[in-house]
């Protein structure tokens, strides 16, 4: 995630893009994540907007995200993301909401290799909470990861993460581009051990 969801990524693009994403880390059709977004590159400040939805009618998490990024030089990029999240469930009529900020850095030491650092949900503010003691949103997360393009159509991605619940979590995945603009993704994470599959189009 430190590379894939890093707000500094918007500073990598030179063309306007619209992208569609779907992934499912639980292998259950009701627990997939569907997203759409676009990126508007600009030499002064690039901008990206994303909307994603996780779950089904009885339980749904919705995320609206605005990302801004700046290229500092040939190797360094920085970015900030602002999120608005809400949770809807049949268990309660209340709709918890949260505002949060992500801070990201990207470093390109050599061609075809990206190294990223991401601080998620720092800070975060609960706009509306459950009156019960149900935890609705995750806390802060610090992630370091990489993205390596082995060949033109194959990427390897890895991430190490630390958060309030886990000292560290590992993620590893691949992305294959069978034809232009279409991506197939597969990966696995630890704590708990979960595989994931996904597709993307842009």
Model-derived segments and their meaning:
Residues 1-202:
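Subset of outer-membrane beta-barrel
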